[in-house]
């Protein structure tokens, strides 16, 4: 899938990630997030969930990505305990100079659509640092709700919000 997007005068292209994008994805991960994963972790997720793993391209370079996975587990949003197929946003990042241009929103929307249509997920969830106000605002704009606080979730001891929404 390849989509051309225009937002605030910036052109970017969204497409499914490929193996030859992994090095650029890892570079973005290391530059923008304190949570870093080994090479094989990205490769496994791309092989297993590639239809929902997207990159944003500007001038032939990857400037953002979303890496998901699909899981079976208890619903994060239903009142009564029930097992559901759900999408999990493992990692999403956009290079700082390309933020606030609609790239993260577009990445999330494309991945959510694929999780629902290609993987039959019923809901989606993610974890976000309680101090990451811009990300929380983005997720709330996309109708994610704070489900609970995960105390000491991150390696540095910071708490996370678990946020979720139906697909």
Curated annotation (Swiss-Prot):
Changing residue 37 to F: Same catalytic efficiency and slight decrease of the affinity for Ser-N-terminal peptide compared to the wild-type. Residues 12-167 form the N-acetyltransferase domain. It holds the Pfam family Acetyltransf_1. The record marks 35 as: Plays an important role in substrate specificity. Zn(2+) binds at residues 88, 127. InterPro entries: AcTrfase_RimI/Ard1 (IPR006464), Acyl_CoA_acyltransferase (IPR016181), Ard1-like (IPR045047), GNAT_dom (IPR000182). Changing residue 37 to A: 34-fold decrease of the catalytic efficiency for Ser-N-terminal peptide and slight decrease of the affinity compared to the wild-type. Loss of acetyltransferase activity for Met-N-terminal peptide. It catalyses: N-terminal L-alanyl-[protein] + acetyl-CoA = N-terminal N(alpha)-acetyl-L-alanyl-[protein] + CoA + H(+); N-terminal L-seryl-[protein] + acetyl-CoA = N-terminal N(alpha)-acetyl-L-seryl-[protein] + CoA + H(+); N-terminal L-methionyl-L-leucyl-[protein] + acetyl-CoA = N-terminal N(alpha)-acetyl-L-methionyl-L-leucyl-[protein] + CoA + H(+); N-terminal L-methionyl-L-glutamyl-[protein] + acetyl-CoA = N-terminal N(alpha)-acetyl-L-methionyl-L-glutamyl-[protein] + CoA + H(+). Substrate binds at residues 37, 154. Changing residue 88 to A: 2.5- and 1.5-fold decrease of the catalytic efficiency and affinity for Ser-N-terminal peptide compared to the wild-type, respectively. Loss of acetyltransferase activity for Met-N-terminal peptide. It comes from the Archaea. Changing residue 127 to A: Same catalytic efficiency and slight decrease of the affinity for Ser-N-terminal peptide compared to the wild-type. Loss of acetyltransferase activity for Met-N-terminal peptide. Acetyl-CoA binds at residues 92-94, 100-105, 132, 139-141. GO terms for molecular function: metal ion binding; protein N-terminal-methionine acetyltransferase activity; protein N-terminal-serine acetyltransferase activity; protein-N-terminal amino-acid acetyltransferase activity; protein-N-terminal-alanine acetyltransferase activity. Displays alpha (N-terminal) acetyltransferase activity. Catalyzes the covalent attachment of an acetyl moiety from acetyl-CoA to the free alpha-amino group at the N-terminus of a protein. NAT is able to acetylate the alpha-amino group of methionine, alanine and serine N-terminal residue substrates, however it has a preference for Ser-N-terminal substrates. NCBIfam families: rimI. This is N-alpha-acetyltransferase. The gene is ard1.
